[in-house]
A protein has these predicted regions:
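Cysteine-centered motifs
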Residues: 5-6
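HIT superfamily nucleotide-processing domains
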Residues: 16-199
């Protein structure tokens, strides 16, 4: 009966969404996966209102030395001269999280979704709040590449991760919510269509 089918489908959707902080939906127009994470809209923002380019001075930077208690415990730390020079921490507002296997749910003609399981980490690649990737010396840049290599190897050993990507988004225009120089490492449960197109 069609009514019972709709009730069952709504119950399935409810169960999936109830346990999923983030989800992926298949764009029916281009066949590419899109990640939807409502919680990321609630991230604190270091920047003043959109019409200003200055930082909000009332909020201490969680990525600066001495504020480590404002972030989750480090997954990896590179030390230099008795203090850290780089840290990798879990993203407090992950787009990808969880150990579920990639499973597609066809919930309607244009509603195809999957849990956004995977790994989402932040790498703070300098303790200097006013530095940037382009200002790292050769030794520091080499350490950063080795640290990223190690994180990629760990992701590759994780069953639900099929593709890992590192990104650096510096400044509000690039989508960063914290002004301190940092990047993100995303362990995805699928290989993005753009990558498959290049093969």
């Amino acid at each position: 009966d069609e009514g019972a089918c709709c009730v069952t489908q709504r119950a399935l959707i409810g169960r999936i969404l109830e346990h999923t902080m983030s989800q992926m939906r298949l764009n029916p127009l281009n066949g590419r996966w899109v990640t939807i994470v409502a919680e990321r809209a609630q991230r604190p923002n270091d920047f003043a209102p959109r019409d200003s380019s200055v930082e909000d001075p009332s909020r201490p930077c969680p990525f600066c030395p001495g504020h480590e208690e404002n972030t989750p415990p480090a997954l990896e730390t590179v030390e230099k001269d008795g203090t850290w020079s780089m840290r990798v921490i879990p993203n407090r507002y992950p787009a990808f999280d969880g150990e579920e296997a990639f499973a597609v749910h066809n919930l309607g003609p244009v509603f195809v979704m999957a849990e956004a399981s995977g790994i989402h980490e932040v790498f703070v690649y300098t303790p200097d709040h006013h530095s940037g990737l382009h200002l790292l010396d050769d030794d520091h840049a080499g350490q950063l590449m080795r640290m990223l290599r190690d994180r990629f190897a760990e992701h590759a050993a994780t069953p639900q991760v099929r593709y890992t990507q590192a990104i650096v988004n510096h400044g509000r225009e690039a989508g960063a919510s914290v002004a301190h120089p940092h990047g993100q490492i995303l362990g995805l449960p699928f290989v993005p269509g753009e990558i498959l197109d290049e093969e």
